[in-house]
Amino acid sequence: MIRTGKQYLESLNDGRNVWVGNEKIDNVATHPKTRDYAQRHADFYDLHHRPDLQDVMTFVDKDGERRTMQWFGHYDKEQLRRKRKYHETIMREMAGASFPRTPDVNNYVLQTYIDDPSPWETQTIGAEGKVKAKNIVDFVNFAKKHDLNCAPQFVDPQMDRSNPDAQQRSPGLRVIEKNDKGIVVSGVKAIGTGVAFADWIHIGVFFRPGIPGDQIIFAATPVNTPGVTIVCRESVVKEDPIEHPLASQGDELDGMTVFDNVFIPWSHVFHLGNPEHAKLYPQRVFDWLHYHALIRQSVRAELMAGLAILITEHIGTNKIPAVQTRVAKLIGFHQAMLAHIVASEELGFHTPGGAYKPNILIYDFGRALYLENFSQMIYELVDLSGRSALIFASEDQWNDEALNGWFERMNNGPVGQPHDRVKIGRVIRDLFLTDWGNRLFVFENFNGTPLQAIRMLTMQRAEFSAAGPYGTLARKVCGIELTEGHDSEYKATAGYAQALDSARHQEKLALSGTMTV
């Protein structure tokens, strides 16, 4: 099945319980605070029906059925790059990567489960014989068959971190009952993006020291399940599509979800009860989402560089050497992001399930590079724009007979039409000088773990002790022999988790003298 936008919008009127700010939403597809972003999801599905994009947006599976590329499995480097082109096409067609949580991103998270489902069964505690690897396989096939949007929601409420017993008293989601048919859960998942627009909630957990086993839940449930309430922040969507060409296209709506005695059948439970298993998956479940994040960041960097070129050409400063060197920063930033993507793909490896996976160290440190520098890049772009990013005529002002001539003269430049400068300014304003744009800024800083967490968690994905590949050359130059006790905790990491990392492949490269990373 290749879902249409119309089918998607009709599916949203299913009785789901959604709040946006102070308003209860009767129908996500039609309410003024949600309908624009619902339409963006409909546009996403309709992209797959465009004849000119058929080979990019769809594929024919092994059963001979054409499906959307979000379900495409990549088993070699070229197939991975084909998947990247698919993601990039969506970003370029939908507001220059301004919507980070489209269905293709959400569903990519399921790849980690389906690649090696057996540990999720064997490592379960307290539900042996009930939680089966087959549950994962069946659910992913079900989602693929119906072309669903399964939004992940993993983050739990912040607690008093000075209190060692805080996790025990957390209102975070937990199992309160198990029976022959399934489990009953209650509690809160504190952050999720676009959950109000999804078909299913993909429930997971980020390990925290002291987390009790009853809070370790990996499962799925429909958004309209009785007892589920999605509580979104207030909307920052703008109404006028001319004045706000991007901010009027919709708001993804981050929010929390309250689960009040929600029943989940065993068939939709993927794992329960084991904090040590959950400890291995803060990044590994989201590896594919993080690869997608780097693609998005590359497209965003390209957009920023392009906007800098457009605005400096239009105001006539592009030939000034000092301006050229500043524009070069933005172009170099994009090239650096692109280099991380290409290198991660080039130095990828095969997972236990046979998928070709990009090098996680390269793309995760690429994400860190973006977060470390993109604030400065935004500053450069806005500063290069001068007043053009903030002070410009509204459309009615521009069209006023008495004012138009003045505006034409004020915005006349060496290239393009005077009104083009207003169009460029509106986009820069929406992206970087509105609450809608600031929400994107905050999202980029914190989704999929913030900067310091990226570094910390990535350092747990390979051997970074003196016994590892980074220490090999240094020990040789220093004339130091390797002794016992140099191994880090990574050596003790479960083999099934290490198999999802690129560390083994990199160690072989390092030991053969090919390269360090």
Curated annotation (Swiss-Prot):
Lineage: Bacteria, Pseudomonadati, Pseudomonadota, Betaproteobacteria, Burkholderiales
Induction of synthesis: Induced by 2,4,6-TCP and subject to catabolic repression by glutamate.
Entry coiled-coil feature ranges: none
Reactions the enzyme catalyzes: 2,4,6-trichlorophenol + FADH2 + O2 = 2-chloro-6-hydroxy-1,4-benzoquinone + FAD + 2 chloride + 3 H(+); 2,4,6-trichlorophenol + FADH2 + O2 = 2,6-dichlorobenzoquinone + FAD + chloride + H2O + H(+); 2,6-dichlorobenzoquinone + H2O = 2-chloro-6-hydroxy-1,4-benzoquinone + chloride + 2 H(+)
Main EC class the enzyme belongs to: oxidoreductase
Pathway: Aromatic compound metabolism; Xenobiotic degradation
Keyword match Nucleotide-binding: no
GO BP terms in the entry: catabolic process
EC code(s) of this entry: 1.14.14.173
The protein's name in its UniProt record: 2,4,6-trichlorophenol monooxygenase
Temperature optimum or stability note: Optimum temperature is 33 degrees Celsius.
PANTHER family: 4-HYDROXYPHENYLACETATE 3-MONOOXYGENASE-RELATED
Subunit structure: Homotetramer in solution.
Gene name of the encoded protein: tcpA
Record key words, sorted: Aromatic hydrocarbons catabolism, FAD, Flavoprotein, Monooxygenase, Oxidoreductase
SUPFAM superfamilies membership: Acyl-CoA dehydrogenase C-terminal domain-like (SSF47203), Acyl-CoA dehydrogenase NM domain-like (SSF56645)
Stored InterPro entries: Acyl-CoA_Oxase/DH_mid-dom_sf (IPR046373), AcylCo_DH-like_C (IPR036250), AcylCoA_DH/oxidase_NM_dom_sf (IPR009100), HpaB/PvcC/4-BUDH (IPR004925), HpaB/PvcC/4-BUDH_C (IPR024719), HpaB/PvcC/4-BUDH_N (IPR024674)
Family designation: Belongs to the FADH(2)-utilizing monooxygenase family.
Protein function: Involved in the degradation of 2,4,6-trichlorophenol (2,4,6-TCP). Catalyzes the conversion of 2,4,6-TCP to 6-chlorohydroxyquinol (6-CHQ). The monooxygenase oxidizes 2,4,6-TCP to 2,6-dichloroquinone (2,6-DCBQ), which remains with the enzyme and is hydrolyzed to 2-chlorohydroxyquinone. 2-chlorohydroxyquinone is chemically reduced by ascorbate and NADH to 6-chlorohydroxyquinol (6-CHQ).
Single GO term (MF): oxidoreductase activity, acting on the CH-CH group of donors
Knockout-associated phenotype: Disruption mutant cannot degrade 2,4,6-TCP. Inactivation completely prevents removal of the chlorophenol.
Top-level taxon of the source organism: Bacteria
